[in-house]
Amino acid sequence: MASVEDATKVQEMLDALKAEYNALAHHSFASKARGNDYESSMIQSQIQEIEAFRKTVDDMYEKQKSIRETYEKDINKLKRELEELGVEANTASYRNRGERSELAASNNQVTHIDQEHPSQTKSTSQPPSNHLPAFQQIPPIHQSAYPQNNVAEVLMPPIPPSVEASSGQNFNQGIASQNPAISTSNLPSTTPLYIPPVNYGANQVSQQPNPQLPGVSNYYNPSATSKPAVNVQPPRIPTKATPSAEPSMTASANAGSISQAGPDGEYQGREQIAPVSDTEAARKTTSQSWYVTYNPACKRVFNINLVHTLEHPSVVCCVKFSNNGKYLATGCNQAANVFDVQTGKKLFTLHEESPDPSRDLYVRTIAFSPDGKYLVTGTEDRQIKLWDLSTQKVRYVFSGHEQDIYSLDFSHNGRFIVSGSGDRTARLWDVETGQCILKLEIENGVTAIAISPNDQFIAVGSLDQIIRVWSVSGTLVERLEGHKESVYSIAFSPDSSILLSGSLDKTIKVWELQATRSVGLSAIKPEGICKATYTGHTDFVLSVAVSPDSRWGLSGSKDRSMQFWDLQTGQSYLTCQGHKNSVISVCFSPDGRQFASGSGDLRARIWSIDPASP
């Protein structure tokens, strides 16, 4: 009897346990179903919000485009009126209401304001520039829906905090060199220009004439107050100046200054000189999308003209001619392109394969082999690729860098490649074996690198403001100190005796290399020999180049301009405003008859250098 009762109790307990288990299982299933429904509804809601936001941005873009077209007609009309009056006006570009308003002033396009004739002033202003939407893709989950990167970031390493602190300060233009005979322009200070942020995955890029600082992340949140319309006045009637034993130069078309340079090539003083106003037409070449202002103090040796405009789907980070001058290579997002220089036709595209096609992979630096058979590219994935141009396939992948590749160069004998990276190293690679044969360690990230034309020296620019020169055997032979901010570009002269450098301090420096003159290490000056310092850009100098005849230096800047510098006299020969965004890369053709530029406005351009008429 007891056993039957026990069995009954056990059965009841099992039934109760089973019922409780079934209840819990049902509750768990119901909770899971509710969770899935909630997650699905939240995701759908977020997608709808993003789509609505994208539609709003697209509508704003269409409205902005319509306003821009209307204002451009008025601007062109005002420009024609000013040219008829013989006046070169500062260009004032204003962004939409509620945004920053920045003044873009070219150093060769500043009008002298005559205080004695205020009645002759004329106020002009220009409307907002094209503001394209930067939200063409839904960003990854870990990213904000608001892109934070800017156009120039695709090329450049992080910007030091000291530069960020000074980015809002005004900058007086001019030239300083060690030759006291060289004079420079004394231009009014202008507010640095900024680029709105860009979504690298987007098909369209904001093309405001307001370039922001280059960097690999968003280091800058510029703020600027609106500026009133620019008062434009006719230039002063030139007055006869007392003859001087020293020749003078003005880098501005309408105003200039005399700068006495001390031993270090920096400013020592300024004296204003009278501008020249009777040769306006001879000093300026104007086209619909570009213009050139020539320095009236320089003898006209050559003119420049636009040959080809090469459109790209993204920011153009680098440009480079082949050694025979027939081809131009450009680097942009996920691709390197090769163009025919004569026709401007794209011959082919070398696609960079990314593990995630939706993410950006910019080709930051590029170079042809001397024989033209290979093209080497440096990208954000920390790899250097050597492409065989006959097959358009990768021959070698040089791996070893631990951060992005910012700069590289091919040796002139074709045997080696040098590269610089944010991992604080510069490396020398053997082209035949694909092996790293030399590793140079630096305290800060490498931003620029070049190998001398005689293949004996490697110059390295870095974030610590110093340029280091090594022998190819790995011996440090020279340190060039003088820049006040990071060095972003360097270039050797063809005879390897001169090095040109561009920096975030807005200057270009000309260095005399002691090591190439067989000077003993004990006799080399510790800080190097700076022959001249050129100051004319209103913003960061991002790229420099030296002409094949060693006569001219070329610089590209965040201020959207390119300048030619006479390396013999130190004068600014011309300024070219040829892009709507930062000029990130410049280079000369091997014969010196052309040069190329790459910009954040999604364009590369090929320009001709034509002899001036006698």
Swiss-Prot record:
Location of the protein in the cell: Nucleus
One Gene Ontology term, aspect cellular component: cytosol
GO BP terms: negative regulation of transcription by RNA polymerase II
Pfam families from the UniProt entry: Tup_N, WD40
Low complexity composition-biased segments: 120-129
Matching PROSITE patterns: WD_REPEATS_1 (PS00678), WD_REPEATS_2 (PS50082), WD_REPEATS_REGION (PS50294)
Spans annotated as Disordered: 93-135, 163-184, 204-267
Entry keyword Thylakoid: no
Superkingdom to which the source organism belongs: Eukaryota
InterPro entries in the cross-refs: G-protein_beta_WD-40_rep, Tscrpt_rep_Tup1_N, WD40/YVTN_repeat-like_dom_sf, WD40_repeat_CS, WD40_repeat_dom_sf, WD40_rpt
Start-end of Polar residues biased regions: 164-184, 218-228, 241-260
Keyword Transcription: yes
GO MF terms held by the record: histone binding; transcription corepressor activity
WD repeats, residue ranges: 311-340, 358-388, 400-430, 441-471, 482-512, 536-566, 578-608
Family: Belongs to the WD repeat TUP1 family.
Primary role: Transcriptional repressor.
Assembly and interaction partners: Interacts with fep1. Binds to histones H3 and H4.
PANTHER family the record matches: F-BOX AND WD REPEAT DOMAIN CONTAINING 7, WD40 REPEAT PROTEIN
Identification of the protein by name: Transcriptional repressor tup11
